[in-house]
UniProtKB/Swiss-Prot annotation:
Site (Involved in substrate activation for the transfer of oxygen from the flavin hydroperoxide): R204
One BP annotation, GO: urate catabolic process
Role played: Catalyzes the hydroxylation of urate to 5-hydroxyisourate (HIU).
Cofactor(s) this protein requires: FAD
NCBIfam families: urate_HpxO
Subunit: Monomer.
Pathway: Purine metabolism; urate degradation
Origin species: Klebsiella pneumoniae subsp. pneumoniae (strain ATCC 700721 / MGH 78578)
Keyword Oxidoreductase included in the entry's annotation: yes
UniProt entry keywords in alphabetical sequence: FAD, Flavoprotein, Monooxygenase, NAD, Oxidoreductase, Purine metabolism
The protein's name: FAD-dependent urate hydroxylase
Signal peptide: none
Gene Ontology MF term list: FAD binding; FAD-dependent urate hydroxylase activity; oxidoreductase activity, acting on paired donors, with incorporation or reduction of molecular oxygen, NAD(P)H as one donor, and incorporation of one atom of oxygen; urate oxidase activity
Length: 384
């Protein structure tokens, strides 16, 4: 049996590894000639870390995951802690530590694990067809590839999604812009083992440790889509949006490199009622494009891969296996997308009365409520 995997990002490579573990040959195709990850880093929470270990890639997480031991929210003006707490209870309850990791490092290490030479780059899909014998995809260079099944892990702009769904869904602007990048850890910004988030005015500034003595940082600002802002205006834009914010925020704006800082308008897509059509399955962002507000986008793709591998260990009936994959994943990924959307709206001031109430909750937070919510999300994954 042979699978075609479209996309060599986190989801596609996880899927290829999972299928190979289940005894299925995989050919992996990637649209671009060189993968340049969108975003500087990614939060891999314990459900994702467990998936990576299950797939044989646990060493990547252990080596490149940042030392995240505490969490704190700080007042945007004073910089004083609203709440601060240890993540030890979360680690104890979930059985794994969270691993914030540079996207470039994660992508590189996963490619090396799969085998960079085993990925065919520069292969952008135009269409696919299914018949009784299998699935065929065609690429923009005129070539084609055939297999017994097809995994569409081609991202939030998936070319194969409309074929599976029977319609072309519209991406939904979440209402905010995110700037993100990497800077050297500086205790004047935040403790080097802590996820620190400054909140106020429906905006936030966050710092999270990754490997090699660096912080992953991001700024969120509720804004209209399509503003004429770029790297040339970046520092001035952030200085304007965060005028009057605490000294560490000003220091971060001064320290960042505009040329390596990403500016992203955040979108999601309404959850789908299906992920499979015949021999073709959607996986990762192609199947559930979410905002990053609960840090579960990459983890969900890893979960997809683990379930995909498991269903093919149970049966070699492709249609039955993919129906079971869909049955196990649809409700889970819908829940994650909608949880992230709800969190997004509260964080970014869609209703400032609710956002102000959240700020007050943070001032009374011991950590227990937040950790309970995170554990509920994490432990609902396929590996518990």
């Amino acid at each position: 049996m042979k699978a075609i995997v479209i996309g060599a990002g986190i989801g596609g490579l996880s899927a290829a590894v999972a299928l190979k573990q289940s005894g299925i040959d995989c050919d992996v195709y990637e649209a671009v000639k060189e993968i340049k990850p969108v975003g500087a880093a990614i939060s891999v929470w314990p459900n994702g870390v467990k998936c990576m270990a299950h797939l044989g890639m646990g060493d990547i997480m252990e080596t490149f995951g940042g030392p995240l031991r505490r969490m704190a929210y700080r007042d945007f003006r004073s910089g004083e802690n609203m709440t601060q707490f240890s993540l030890a209870p979360l680690i104890e309850r979930t059985g794994s530590r969270p691993c914030p990791v540079s996207r470039a490092e994660l992508q590189r290490e996963m490619l090396d694990y799969w085998g960079r030479d085993s990925v065919q780059f520069g292969k952008r899909v135009t269409r696919c067809e299914e018949d009784a014998d299998g699935v065929t995809v065609w690429f923009t260079d005129g070539s084609s590839a055939s297999g017994d099944l097809l995994i569409a892990a081609d991202g939030s702009h998936s070319a194969l999604r409309p074929w599976v769904l029977g319609f072309t869904p519209q991406r939904r602007y979440a209402g905010y812009v995110n700037w993100n990048g990497l800077v050297e850890i500086d205790e004047a910004l935040a403790p080097g083992d802590q996820w620190t988030t400054f909140v106020g005015e429906g905006k936030r500034v966050s710092l999270m440790p990754v490997s090699a003595g660096r912080f992953y940082f991001f700024f969120d600002v509720p804004l209209p889509a399509g503003l004429a802002e770029d790297r040339d205006t970046l520092r001035a834009d952030l200085s304007r949006y965060f005028a009057g914010w605490a000294p560490p925020v000003q220091k971060l704006i001064a320290a960042l490199d505009p040329q390596t800082t990403n500016r992203i308008e955040i979108h999601d897509i309404e959850p789908f009622s299906r992920l499979v059509r015949g021999r073709v399955a959607l996986l990762g962002d192609a199947g559930h494009s979410t905002t990053p507000d609960i840090g579960q986008g990459g983890c969900a793709a890893m979960e997809d891969a683990v379930v995909l591998g498991a269903v093919f260990r149970q049966t070699r009936d492709i249609a039955a296996a993919l129906r079971e994959y869909e049955a196990q994943r649809c409700d889970r990924v819908r829940d994650l997308v909608l949880k992230a959307r709800k969190r997004c709206d509260i964080t970014h001031g869609k209703d400032m009365q609710l956002t102000e109430a959240w700020y007050q909750e943070l001032r009374e937070e011991t950590g227990e409520r937040i950790i309970n919510g995170m554990c509920d999300t994490i432990l609902s994954g396929p590996l518990g």
